[in-house]
């Protein structure tokens, strides 16, 4: 009877943990509008009022949201739109168009996407338009309900705004800003960019039609606020089904936030970047260690997750190389030391390697030249070395100039962790100059 009871308890526990994983992963990955905003309340209020003026009073506006990657630009606009759409008269009337500079790479593709998102494919049909402006005006005209006074407001969100500035003649931006300045259909144009010099990219005619409103997000919070964000991001909501488990989980999160080793981990991440994406990555890796047998996150989980976050991917590749490839990297290291980072070619590396082989009484490392060449090419495929210039068909591979993409510290750290690294190879690496 007791075994049956413990089995049902473990099932409940597993179900609970799967819900925890789902809720927190959703929060970390999607930055859903249900999560809280941190340190951008003033900017949020400004943007929210701007959108309401367009949606409720038919006032056209344009604004740029500027901030580094991961500062919360998308989350800010998503929160503002969510709040706006909760107003009944707005949700039935306002239309949204989301464009991305990485996807809509020219104005023709952008116009097709605008037509699709406004559900006007049937209205456009096979019509032929003289210009981009005429086509866009027709689309917005089609949204009018009856008379000119009851136009349907449209909110345009342009992600990666700086990429739209590279479109030919900036026609899309010109027409959107032109409409926002005129008494046509009420529209709000919201650009999201990480370029501080964005206005310098705009043509004079485009710049003159832009309202010059800018909202800056700079992650200006301090470390105490960062710890508070850590707690809020890990805590379970009040509506979590299992109240007892949620209470225990949140108590554990509170304990973690006060733990000295956890605070050291958070301080390290905070000093590197205030970017909330890096914090979410840290928490995601730590969350992956939570299982039915290990139901609560610990300081060790966060410390190991931090090590994974700061892991050197190039040094990790070195751990999987053959001894011959390691020897070639050491030869390149010595060439860099001797010639002060000057580029090298295969022949120079091969000669350096041969000096090492000749110093040894045994011939364990005595490989044929084509074999060494193959190992050298493999290092190029792994992008541990790169050619200085594009190769021409008739150039000899042995004399093509290369550059090593690892520094001395990375090489030495990788050698320390290299499994069963031969002693003489390690000694060769640590010698101050090559075998001259």
From Swiss-Prot:
Q: Which residues are the signal sequence here?
A: none
Pathological association? Meier-Gorlin syndrome 2: A syndrome characterized by bilateral microtia, aplasia/hypoplasia of the patellae, and severe intrauterine and postnatal growth retardation with short stature and poor weight gain. Additional clinical findings include anomalies of cranial sutures, microcephaly, apparently low-set and simple ears, microstomia, full lips, highly arched or cleft palate, micrognathia, genitourinary tract anomalies, and various skeletal anomalies.
Q: How does it assemble?
A: Component of ORC, a complex composed of at least 6 subunits: ORC1, ORC2, ORC3, ORC4, ORC5 and ORC6. ORC is regulated in a cell-cycle dependent manner. It is sequentially assembled at the exit from anaphase of mitosis and disassembled as cells enter S phase. Interacts with DBF4. Interacts with POLQ.
Where this protein primarily resides, as one coarse class?
nucleus
Family per similarity comment: Belongs to the ORC4 family.
PANTHER family named among the record's database cross-references: ORIGIN RECOGNITION COMPLEX SUBUNIT 4 (PTHR12087:SF0)
Q: Where in the cell is it found?
A: Nucleus
- What residues bind ATP, as annotated? 67-74
Among InterPro entries, the record links this protein to:
AAA+_ATPase (IPR003593), AAA_16 (IPR041664), ORC4 (IPR016527), ORC4_C (IPR032705), P-loop_NTPase (IPR027417)
Please give the superkingdom of this protein's source.
Answer: Eukaryota
Give the gene name. ORC4
Per its record, how is this protein called by name? Origin recognition complex subunit 4
Family matches, as Pfam families: AAA_16, ORC4_C
Entry's Gene Ontology BP terms? DNA replication initiation; polar body extrusion after meiotic divisions; protein polymerization
Q: What are the annotated disulfide bridges?
A: none
């Amino acid at each position: 009877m007791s075994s049956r009871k413990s089995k049902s308890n473990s099932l409940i526990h597993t179900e609970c943990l799967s819900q925890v994983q789902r809720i927190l992963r959703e929060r970390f990955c999607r930055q859903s509008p249900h999560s809280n905003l941190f340190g951008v309340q003033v900017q949020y209020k400004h943007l929210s009022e701007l959108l309401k003026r367009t949606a409720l009073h038919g006032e056209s506006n344009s604004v740029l949201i500027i901030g580094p990657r991961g500062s919360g630009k998308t989350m800010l606009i998503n929160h503002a739109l969510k709040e706006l759409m909760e107003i009944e008269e707005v949700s039935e009337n306002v239309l949204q168009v989301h464009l991305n500079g990485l996807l809509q790479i020219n104005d023709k593709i952008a116009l097709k996407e605008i037509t699709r998102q406004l559900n006007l494919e049937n209205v456009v049909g096979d019509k032929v338009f003289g210009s981009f402006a005429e086509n866009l005006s027709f689309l917005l005209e089609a949204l009018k309900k009856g008379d000119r006074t009851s136009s349907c407001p449209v909110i345009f969100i342009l992600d990666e705004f700086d990429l739209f500035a590279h479109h030919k003649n900036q026609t899309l931006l010109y027409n959107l800003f032109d409409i926002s300045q005129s008494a046509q259909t009420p529209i709000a144009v919201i650009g999201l960019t990480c370029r501080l010099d964005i206005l310098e990219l705009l043509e004079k005619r485009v710049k003159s039609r832009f309202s010059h409103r800018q909202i800056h997000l700079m992650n200006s919070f301090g470390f105490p606020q960062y710890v508070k964000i850590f707690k809020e991001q890990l805590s379970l909501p009040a509506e979590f089904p299992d109240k007892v488990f949620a209470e225990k989980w949140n108590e554990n999160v509170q304990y973690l936030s006060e733990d000295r080793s956890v605070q050291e981990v958070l301080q390290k991440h905070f000093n590197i970047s205030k970017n909330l994406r890096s914090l979410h990555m840290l928490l995601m890796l730590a969350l992956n260690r939570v299982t039915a047998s290990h139901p609560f996150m610990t300081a060790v989980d966060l410390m190991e997750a931090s090590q994974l976050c700061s892991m050197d991917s190039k040094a990790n590749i070195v751990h999987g190389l053959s001894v011959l490839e390691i020897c070639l990297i050491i030869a390149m290291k010595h060439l860099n030391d001797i010639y002060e980072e000057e580029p090298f070619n295969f022949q120079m590396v091969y000669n350096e390697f041969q000096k090492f082989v000749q110093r040894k009484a045994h011939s364990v490392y005595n490989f044929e030249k084509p074999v060494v060449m193959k190992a050298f090419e493999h290092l190029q495929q792994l992008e541990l070395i790169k050619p200085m210039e594009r190769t021409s068909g008739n150039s000899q591979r042995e004399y093509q100039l290369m550059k090593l993409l690892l520094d001395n510290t990375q090489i030495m750290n990788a050698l320390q962790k290299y499994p069963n690294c031969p002693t003489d190879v390690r000694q060769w690496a640590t010698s101050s100059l090559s075998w001259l």
